[in-house]
Structures are given as structure tokens and as C-alpha cells.
Amino acid sequence: AELKAEWAKEDATLASFKDTKHSQYGGDLSRKGKATGYFHVEKKKGKWWFVAPDGYLFLSISANGISPGGGGSIRNPLKGLYTDKAPEGFVAPQLPVMNRPQTAPQGAPQGMMRPQQPDKYIYLTAWNNFRRFGTENVQAKANQLVVDRMNYWGMNTIGNWSSRDVIALGKKPFMVSLSGLGINNGILGMPDVYEEGFAASVDEGIRRSVEPYIGNKMLIGYFVGNEPTWSNIELRLCELIMEADDARPLKKALVSYLQKNGDTDQARIAFVYETYEKFLSAVSTSLKKYDPNHLNLGIRYGSGVPSQEVLALSKKYFDVYSFNNYGLQPNLANMDIIYKATGMPMIIGEYHFGTTDRGLGESLVRVTSQKDRGVAYRNYTEKAFSHPALIGTSWFTWYDQPLFGRGDGENYNIGLLDATDRPYEWMVKAIQAVSENCYDVHSGKKAPFDQIPERAGGTFPDFWE
């Protein structure tokens, strides 16, 4: 009864909210750029901006994994520990799988859909949709709740790995990943561009990826990949290529290159960049062919600064430079280095803060309370938007991870919502404050929020790196 009362209170709050400050695409009605009919980027008075299709300036405030029901967890990790049953009529959600070369099945396309596995996964958050809405039109009601929450919170963009049903409502701008690019079949995330038919395969993958979105004015753009492992360890990549099967085209190409240019560290690194450019060129050519109206949001690099050669290639082929940056603060010094080399607008694709006070893991960046999660979010996000190139941030992730862990066991307190489908109050307040202030912060009219969380524990090692 207490939980249903809280849900009802939230429903009433959401129903009474009206947004009068933003256009239908989420742009700031007080700031104008050029209307082109699609999202694009513009530099005005030394600051980069997204510009919405109707011409209003737009800063993207987003979260990854936005969905009406989370991702599920492994059933009964300890035999007999969990015996609850799914509500009658429940259908397991199909959610995009994060593309990590270390875990994706061999040959799996980037952004593939996880199959329904009701016998393996416990979908606690999705079950709550049935408890909240009953069985009539439950999915439609749950999808609309996502949009209503985004409106009230001030979150204007559906981030990566999110529900296609929510995207299909056509009520919020969104970003998606391209599929079928050969990344998962590569080595350390470097595709084998020398494989017979590689360009044709990429072309077909992109054609299929963009087909549902051509002409969709809510789409901001496409990501090409996520955290390429080989970046800044190019020599290690070459070692692994040389250890591969002799029949592998990528190895044959490296051996041939070194025979012609000498087997030196410089030659090996040069081969990596030449290979990477072949990949980026193939992707760029096909993307422009099939969908020239939407942005190439690039590969979300890791937290460090890639080499100058990689930065130059990013400038050549991407419209926006994207990177993930876990830390108590955005790394403005690194952003300055990247901006000096590329002059490009930027997106932070992942960051988060967590704590242990809900019985979950602390996350990659630890603070000591739910209040401090909100403080950390506002501090980080407004400081990020104070950079002249930063035009978007995407929190990771929408829901807390399950207590028993997602597929790889990760169980962090990193959600905007908990397992009982209740928003974290301090996070909501922080997002609302960022939404209210970010345009003035970015334009230089207002200083970013400078309070920092008390006794924050710093950064936990990221074992994905």
C-alpha cells in the first residue's frame, strides 16, 4: 500500500507538469540558431551547440539505458534464494545489449537485442509495471511514464542502449548506435578491414541500422562504437594480431606492411592508424550515402586522451567527438587537449556516482549518500557544460542494476530509479537544476555549481579498461 501510494503521488505530480520553456524538440525557446529540419551543430560566439530541427539551441541531457523496466538479473544465483514469480501476463523485455568485444557473442552485431529469457532472468523492475498499471495497456502506460518523467526532470534526450518502444513514441530526441560494423569480430575492438567483403558488410550493416530512422527528426545522430580497447595500447594490439592465426587477413596485412616498411614500433603504430582510417572511411561513406541528414557522433572513447593521430582521424570523419569520463569531476584539462587538436563539439557518453546505502555496489565513482549523488551530479554536469565544446552529457544508467547483478555480475547503485520504480529524489532535483542552468552556464552568463560531495571515496578501478 505504501509503495502504491508513492506511485500515485508521482503520477499526480507528473500529470500537473507543463513545460513552457522548450520547443517540441527540446530546444531552448530563448536561443536561436539556423533551422535546417534536422539536428546539427553550430558554433556561436565561441561556443558549440546542438541546434534542434526548428532552429532552437539544444544541450543534450541524457541517460543510457532508458526503458520502462530495466535489464533483468540472473535467476537464483544461489540455489533457491529467489522464489518469486512473474506477474500473470508478463512478457520479458527485449533490451539492447551493450557492445563490449570482451563479452559479446562471436559475430553478434553491435547493439543487438537480448533475447527473451524468462527462465534465466528476473525482471524485477519490469514486473513492477504490472503491479503499478495492472494488465490493460501496461506497456503503453509504462512507456508514457518514461516520457513524463523525462519531461518533469528536465532530461531531453534518450541515450544509448535505450528502449526502442520509448523511442518509437516520437516524443523525445534520441541517439542510437550503428550495428554490423565488424567491431566484435576484431581484435581489441579493431575490425578486420582486410577481410574479403568487409566494406560491403559494413555498408549493409549501416543500411539496416539507419533504415528505421531516415527522415526521423527526433534522431540526433549515430554512435559508431564504444571504448575501443586498442586506443593508447597500439603496440599491444599489434602483438595480439601477430599471435593470431596466419590465415587471418588482419595479420597478413600487418606482416606485409612490416615487410615493406620495416618492423619497428613506429611502423606498427602507423599500421594501426592506417587500419583505423580504413574502418572510419568505410563507415563514413556508407552513413553519408544512406542517411546524410543525421550526425555521426563518433566512437565513445575512454577517459584518456587518444594519440594526436587518432584525434586527427576523429576530426576528419566525425561530426561530434564523444568520450566516456568516470570521475568526481569532468576532466576539463583533457577536454582542452582534445579541443585544441580537433576544434570539435563534444559529448560525454557515460559517467555516474553511487553509494552503498541501498545495499548495492558503490559504482565506479563512490560518494557517501543519496544526497551526495545529487550534489556530485550537478557539480560534474554543470562544470562539463562550462566547457565551450561540451554539448551533451549522458548518465549511466536509468535504473539501478539488480541486486543479484546483471549478466556479468555488476550490481551498482547508479540508477535514477530504484528496483521498486521510485525516483531518487536528490538525483531528480539535481537534474532539474542542471536543466534550468546549463544554457546560462554554457553561454558564460552563470558560473557552474561548485559544491562538491563530502567525503567522496574516489574512483573504483574500471575492469572494462
Task: Indicate residue ranges for each PLM-predicted region.
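Glycoside hydrolase catalytic-domain groove-lining segments
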Residues: 270, 274-285, 289-363, 382
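Substrate-binding cleft of secreted/luminal carbohydrate-active enzymes
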Residues: 216-221, 225-226, 351, 365-418, ...
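Conserved, mostly hydrophobic/aromatic
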Residues: 55, 150, 158, 222, ...
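Aromatic- and acidic-residue-enriched segments that line the glycan-binding/catalytic groove
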Residues: 66-81, 169-184, 217, 224-260, ...
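Active-site clefts of carbohydrate-active enzymes
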Residues: 121-129, 185-192, 265-267, 302-303, ...
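Active-site-adjacent substrate/metal-binding segments within catalytic domains
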Residues: 2-169, 187-218, 262, 266-274, ...
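Aromatic-rich peripheral "rim/lid" segments of glycoside hydrolase catalytic domains that contact
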Residues: 238-252, 396-465
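Short, solvent-exposed turn/loop segments enriched in Gly/Ser/Thr/Pro and often Arg
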Residues: 161-166, 180, 223-229, 300-304, ...
